[in-house]
Amino acid sequence: MNDEQLLRYSRHLLLEDIDIAGQEKLLNSHVLIIGAGGLGSACAPYLAAAGVGQITLVDHDRVELTNLQRQIMHQNNSVGMSKVWSGKRFLNNLNPGITIHAIEQKADEALLEELVMQVSVVIDCTDNFITRHLINRISLKHGKTLVSGASIGFDAQISVFDFRQASSPCYACVFPPDPHFVETSCASMGVFSPLVGIIGSLQAAQALQILIGFGEPLLGRLLIWNARNSQIDEIKIQRNLDCPVCGAH
């Protein structure tokens, strides 16, 4: 690290679990964030500020006025702009010493197959089950660690699936694919604005722990947050041997 980096990341360097070696791991890391909305708007800035060397941001949406209630990576002058380019502008201003890749495309199977294999950690900040299941399947296929978060109304959840370990459960073990499932969204159900910030920040924290290799990430655990009463519950996740996605791996 150069002198500017030593100063910028000095508060990390004081932490025994991070120190210079851990910070250098971050600077040499590449993370994929899928979704530049509410969760991504909290997750991406903390990863950028922490010094993750490369961040690939994927989203096909454009910023709308209704997004600004919670998506703090975007501003009034971002309305109508691509979310990933708005996000790239924000993150570059926050930390010009890292690289932000903006991919203005829908996260379909072909794109994810190309991107997932290039990164160390995949962070799911999307808002629908179809995409979450696709991200889960491709992360499993390539043996990547997946940090999954979701938030709607006053309820949210986060978990980590480490597909470097053959014994790891997957997202489908907890939420099996259901062709008859009716999607809900913030547009129809609403969302408590600070909640996406809490979960997105936790996603960033989990990713940093995994990249550096310290502490006890939420492996095999689902953390559930109720913002009405600030109640936090934790559920242990067991691998489902009959899971249609990971049951054979």
Where are these regions (language model features)?
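Adenine nucleotide-associated cytosolic modules
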Residues: 1-249
